[in-house]
Amino acid sequence: MQQATKQPAVLLVHDYYQVPGGEDVVVANEKHLLETHGHAAALYVRRNEEISRMGALEKIRSALGMFFSIRTYREVRRSIRENRISLVHVHNTLPLIGPAVYYAALRESVPVVQTVHNFRLLCPNALFYRDGHICEDCTKKGLHCAVKHRCYRGSRLQTVLCVLSTRLHRALKTYSRLHYITLTDFNRQKLLALKQIPPENVSVKPNFVEPSETIVPYAARENQVVYIGRLDALKGIRLLLEAWARYERSGGGMKLIICGTGPEEAWCREYLTREKLKQAELRGFVPNSAARALMGQSKALILPTQWYEGFPMTIVEAFSAATPVICSDLGNAGSLISDGVTGFKFPADSAEQLAQTLNRLQHAESISDGALKTYQENFTAEANYRQLMAIYSKAMQKSGERNEPSCG
C-alpha cells in the first residue's frame, strides 16, 4: 500500500492590527485551508495592542525592531525547528515583527513567501492615497516625500523610522530574496516598480470566500442596488450620492441601500434630506452574513472607490451570489471587474457616468451568470488551494536549488 505523501508544514506569520481588519480574516482562512488539506500550520503572531502595555524602554526596543528584532529572529528560528517548518508564509510584519522574520527563515534555509496586502514596500502609509487624492510621490520622487507629509501614522518620527528601515533593507537587498503573492495583477505591476524584486518571484493569487448559501434568480430579485462599506470620502460615498441624485431625477426606479458607518455619515444624512432623495436608505452597520444575503437579493453591488484599494472582499462575495458589481475603474478594485462580463466600470471622477451606468442593469441576467462563473473558476477555496500550492512548490524548488552543495 502506497504511503500518503506528507504535506509540507507551514509557519504563518502575522502582526495583528489594533482594529481587526481583512488581513486578519485572510490569515485565519488560510490556516484553516491548509489544515483542511493535511498541512501542519503553525502561527507566529504579535498584536499591536501589546504596545499600549509597554514601558518607555520596551517601546524604544520595539521601534528599533522595524530595522531588526532580535526577539523575532530568535523566536521564529525556534518555531521553525520545533515545528519542522518547510516554508514561512508572512502577512503583516509592522510594527512588532519586522524584517528579522525573513532573516530567521533564510538562516534556517527555509523559503519565505510574503503576501502583499497593501503598498507598504513602496509607500509608507501603504495606501498610495494622501490628502484626498491618489499619491505615488514616494515611487516617483523618493521616500523622503513621506517624511514631509508624516505619512506613517501621522507622525514625522515614526515615518522617519519606517523610511529608514525600508531604505536599509532595500540596500541590503532583503526584498530580492523573497517570493511574493500579490492579490491582483495591478498590485503585481506596482510591486515590480521595486526593481530588485525578480518578476519570476511574484505570483498573483486572490483571496477566497465561501460560497453563498443561496443563489436568487436575477429576475426574482428586489429592484434595488446596495453599497456596503465605510462611509468615507476615499470610498466614494459622496460621489455615489451625487450620482444617485441624478439617477432619481432622471426617473430611475431602483432603490439604493447603504450599509456602513463612518466619518461621512452625518454628511450623507444631510445630503439625502437636502436633495429630497426618496429612494436611498441608510441602514448603518450590517453584519457580514446579513450583508451577503442583501447582496444576493440585489441587482448590483456598487463600489465607487476613489483609491486603489487592497482586495475588496465584497466584490468576491457579490460574485459568489451571482451579483454584478458596478465599480470605479481604479486600481485593484477596477482590475477585478470585467466590464460587461461580471459588472460595469465607470470613470472614478464622474458622478454623471455612474448615474448612466445604473441604467445598464435593465438587462443584466448574463452579467449575473458571468459573475457566478468567475467566482467558481477563481475565488473558491479549492481554486485558491491549487494556486497556493503552485506558489509554495515554486518557492521550495528555488530554495532547494540555492541550498544544494556545489559540485566544483
Residue ranges and their predicted role:
Residues 24-25, 223, 227-246, 263-269, ...:
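A conserved mid-protein helix/loop that constitutes part of the nucleotide-sugar donor-binding site
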Residues 339-340, 344-351, 359-365:
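Conserved acidic donor-binding segment of nucleotide-sugar-dependent glycosyltransferases
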Residues 269-289:
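Nucleotide-activated donor-binding/catalytic signature segment of Leloir-type glycosyltransferases, i.e.
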